[in-house]
Amino acid sequence: MKTLFKGSLARLFATTALAGVLGALPLLATAAEVKEIRIAVPDLSAGTEHSGGGVVDVLRSRQIFEKAFADQGIKVQWNFFKGAGPVINEAFANGQVDFAYLGDLAAIIGKSNGLDTRLLSATARGVKQYLGVVPGSGIKTLQDLKGKRVAVFRGTASQLSFDAALASQGLSEKDFKVINLDFSAAVAALAAKQIDASWGSSNLTALQAKGLAELPVSTRDLGGAGSIQSVLVGSGAFVDAHPDVVDKLLKAQQQAVEWLTQDGNKDAYVQLVSGLASYPQVILQQDLKDEKLSEIFPSQLDPVFLGKLQGSVDLASQQKLIRKPFKVTDWVAPNLAAAGL
């Protein structure tokens, strides 16, 4: 019986060990078989070319990721979505993308709704937003806007920005007739006077330049309330399976960040983004006139950035934009995030 028991035990250990080895093989194979990196970006362009602004346009124009992974035969696929954050979250849920450059609310909604994403890098901070109104409307403050028709792109960073701006003035969305329009539709509706106002980014300055809108309020006027943070997030499955690839991607991104955070490159940056996005250069020049690129585009997930991002999570929860609040520090990918660069 002893011999039989020992033999059975030996076979059991051998079978278990073999199962462990075989079970690990798919994981090892997967880790070694990265053929393509799929990156999602909200498309901010008004023309036929794609633009994500910020670090994305620098990365693509210089083919930084493509060059970084060329020696491994890994292709980089950029996917631009006009539907912005909500559509990108769907792509994450369907396993169609590995990374995404997103504004704060879209990334927060995805995480809160159960998407397994990891926070890898800051990509912008303190980005201004504007209130655009019909010329001659007499609207000078957010208080003046009560009861009016305001276009906001729901599910995007602009919605959270709007809510934060309102909260700073003791207001909420309930005080207005909020209409969900994407950025292009909102600009068209405001120009046609089909709405009273729109909350959005520098694209509203194009209407101002044409005399089709006034911009009485910006987040700068509100002491920064409503300014936007942007991030790079990665699929949890990809990050866990390919930490070396993620590490290499973040280090390659720093090449773009180092160029972008040099204030002397502001004119070149304006020219780059304007060309890709089909915006008149004066729009971005006006938007960035009093701004320092060195303050907008650092990639570190420092305590100040994480604190503001946590504030965004808390506000989104208070405004019932998300169901489950969470700790931003638990979202950060350990040992890989830009905090360690």
Mark where each language-model region is.
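Short, polar/charged alpha-helical segment
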Residues: 36, 46-76, 112-113, 308-311
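Pocket-lining segment of extracytoplasmic ligand-binding domains
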Residues: 105, 179, 185-276
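Conserved C-terminal helix/tail region of periplasmic/extracytoplasmic solute-binding proteins
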Residues: 310-341
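A local structural motif
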Residues: 33-36, 68-81, 96-98, 168-180, ...
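Immediate post-signal peptide segment of exported/extracytoplasmic ligand-binding proteins
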Residues: 27-49, 69-74, 137-149, 317, ...
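A bilobed periplasmic-binding-protein/Venus flytrap-type ligand-binding module shared by bacterial periplasmic
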Residues: 41-43, 129-139, 228-244
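Secondary-structure end/capping motifs
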Residues: 45-50, 240-321
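Short helix-initiation/N-cap motifs at beta->coil->alpha
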Residues: 78-90, 103, 176-191
